[in-house]
Swiss-Prot record:
Keywords: Ribonucleoprotein, Ribosomal protein, RNA-binding, rRNA-binding. Belongs to the bacterial ribosomal protein bS6 family. One of its GO terms (biological process) is translation. Binds together with bS18 to 16S ribosomal RNA. SUPFAM superfamilies: Ribosomal protein S6 (SSF54995). This is Small ribosomal subunit protein bS6. Residues 94-149 are annotated as: Disordered. GO terms for cellular component: cytosolic small ribosomal subunit. Disulfide bonds: none annotated. NCBIfam families: S6. GO terms for molecular function: small ribosomal subunit rRNA binding; structural constituent of ribosome. It comes from the Bacteria.
Length: 149
């Protein structure tokens, strides 16, 4: 059997429980056709780069699949029919990655400083420093005006 990574995007207006039900439905299809589902990662509701079928957000789900090609084709056929699925992509891989995917690692980064001023290396002005005093304008002579006729 071949190894696949399968990602699908579900509509924004369905609940997370309905997304889990979709995952279970497609797991059942794969197992009925002789396949197995390894890791399932729900990446949550994320903004789309562009609108897809009038949706600006979507639920992202990653599934690691070990199944024969006909089982994968059946899952893709059912996803084409389902109106809750906006997009899907199946990629054949040599082996499945261990641990969390890159998207989950990005979410788990707690060592990054927050953007709300939690950066000790900068003052309150970013990296510019304090603003110079602008009280020197009264010391300069006014420029002569040229009257235009």
């Amino acid at each position: 059997m071949a190894l696949y990574e399968h990602v699908f995007l579900a509509r924004q207006d369905i609940t997370p429980q309905q997304v889990d039900a979709l995952v279970e439905q497609y797991k059942g299809v794969l197992e009925a056709n002789g396949g197995k589902v390894g890791r399932v990662e729900n990446w949550g509701l994320k903004s789309l780069t562009y609108r897809i079928k009038k949706n600006r957000k979507a639920h992202y789900v990653l599934m690691d699949i070990d199944a024969p090609a006909p089982a994968v084709h059946e899952v893709e056929r059912q996803m084409r029919i389902n109106e809750d699925i906006l997009r899907y992509m199946t990629i054949a891989v040599e082996k499945h990655e261990e641990g969390p995917s890159a998207m989950m690692q990005k979410r788990d980064r707690d060592d990054r400083p927050r953007r709300d001023g939690d950066r000790p290396d900068r003052g309150g002005f970013g990296d510019r420093g304090p603003r110079p005093d602008r009280g020197d304008r009264d010391d300069r002579p006014r420029r002569p005006r040229e009257d235009r006729a």
